Amino acid sequence: MSGILEQETVMGIVEAKNLTFEYIRRDEEGNVEGITTAVDNVNIDIKAGDFVAVLGHNGSGKSTFAKHLNALVMPTEGTVYVDGMDTKDSGNTLSIRQTAGMVFQNPDNQIVGTLVDEEVGFGPENIGVPTEEIWERVEKSLKAVGM
């Protein structure tokens, strides 16, 4: 060996290839009225341990990009991989959501239940935890904080 280490090619924990997402506006009959490109041909490869910030003005596509990371929306074009899983493959959705989480910047977008126990149970429900186990976790969690 000549002292030069060969770098192993490793897929990132998040990888977007030619990611494009378009919002399509339709009239009441379903005819296309307009298309807005929110994410335009983004390529990024984030490795374990990387720190990444996505910055931009309001309406620049940051949240739309983030929604691709846990398969809340699907690319119009291109591909997004999370821990090697293609977000377009519906068979991967649960595993992706167990791997990549999201916390919205506005609390009104995060609160989903009208009762505290529904809100506490929201996360486990979205990652496929069985209902009985969800309620056990909710009860234990609320008890731990005196509720």
Feature roles, as predicted:
Residues L55-H57:
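The feature captures the beta-strand-to-loop junction immediately N-terminal to the Walker
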Residues P130-M147:
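Conserved ABC ATPase "signature" region
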